[in-house]
Amino acid sequence: MKNRRSNISDSVRKELEFDKVLSLLEGFAKSATNKQRICSLSILHNPKVLNHYLDCLQEYQYIQSDTNFPRFEYINLKEVINYLKIENAVLTEDQFFDVYNASIWVNSLKHFLNNNDYDTPAILQLIGDLKKNLYLKKRIEKVFTPRRFIRSQASEILFGIRQDISNKRSQLDKHFQETMSHYAHLGYLDDIRESFADGVHLLAVSSEYKRKVKGQVRGQSNTKSITFIEPEKCISLNRELAHLYEEEKDEIRRILKVLTSDLSAHLEKIEAYFNLIEEVDFLDAKSQLAKLMQANRPKVSSSRAISIKKAFHPLLLIENNKKGIETIPQDIYFDDKHRVVVISGPNAGGKSIALKTFGLNQLMLQAGLFIPVHPNSSMSIFHDVFTDIGDNQSIANELSTYSYRLTRMKEILLKSGKSSFILIDEFGSGSDPSLGGELAGVFFEEIVNSGAYGVLTTHYGNIKVLVDQTKFAENACMLFDDTQLNPLYKLKVGQPGSSYTFEVARNVGLPEDIIEKARAGLKHGTVRFEDTIYHYQRLSTELQLAQEELSKQVLTEIGRAHV
């Protein structure tokens, strides 16, 4: 499956905080390759390719929930594979067991899938033609014990050497014990009687008797009261034993070299194991992120009928969950007749968060991640995502906020089209309200005419009116409790929002004469328009709250009925 990847600009990543999501995802990945892969993760816009990635994640989460699923632990075989390509190379003990454990896990996964009725076509495609094969496991077991010791049966030569070592040690122990008993009886030994150094048993002789003991002096205690002597009868036996240990070491190296050579013949299989482990590590990281964000898989299609239900801002949800604070989900819909949604309402009412919620979830989904929305949500795919969010000043180019935003707007208008998703916060701000509002109106018409989809936030009354008069656009507002003068952080599509400018001013105790003077300074039409929006939104909010309260009561009654 071919797919063209969109290169999301750094500004879009930063403004939508996609980089923070990727940082969380990177923290769950164990593979250095996957960490790098995550840092450069971009969005996909081939529905077939995207759905394949989402299928893999969904199937992985499904089978992973089974208690019999083989526990995944990342195994880095990169160095092993590089060594196996070098002639006469010898793997270390840890590297052999990395191959061993990888073989066990891959074969356990195959066994699990073969013996369960899970429908996992995407996972099976990921595994490819890897078949259950225990050769590598059994070959390593012929050499190593479960406790990582080299088996004596690994070769006839090693078996013989170890028998000789055992016999020689028995002789040595016998001679040493006899010698120690003899000198102990004569009273030549210190209370500790014996010591051990460099693999050799030594007599702990009181220094005053050192010349009476036959053997080779190996050292003295710090006080020089004890002299450590290797008994004469043991010297030749220790040399023979040391020689046998060297023979054992050489034979073990030969065995491991042969084993390495045997594994090299199966390099392709080991590479396939590692590729699968890398992919599962990536899936596991995405699965852990999904659990952290309480994320789901929405429906994805090439259709532009979009219905996003109960969408949370992923990062806000994580932060609020830590603090035990409720996060309010948002709903929004788009189709061919409603392509652009313009959100208005008071400051600190949640407009910007709502806009970022839809933008960030869109990026995450197209990057192959699950998102915190209701699973019955339907989403589409966009080739480009454009943003203009926040107070951006280009100090290097000496551009004011407004100049910068005009430059961004120019770029958006030049590059956007039917397959674009546009997100603009505080649309038209940064200049004189009357002039900025008029220019914003023209920009708005251009955005709508481009065929793009988008979410915009604004304070401008003329934009709210223009939206109402535009065929492919729709107003939306953030609900507000005008009694308590508190934002409800809930988006409602279908009506513009009031700024609640004078209501908030009264709430903070601003004198009424100042408020009335400010109202009198406004054009009569502006005051009437704002009052109309205010009263309409007030009724709408009251109705919304009443519906929610009724729903709670109904659910409570249903719960009681089932007790």
Regions found by a protein language model. Name each.
Residues 261-320:
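Phosphate-binding P-loop/Walker A region and its immediate neighborhood
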Residues 79-82, 118-191, 220-282:
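Extended, charged alpha-helical coiled-coil/arm scaffolds that mediate oligomerization and mechanical coupling
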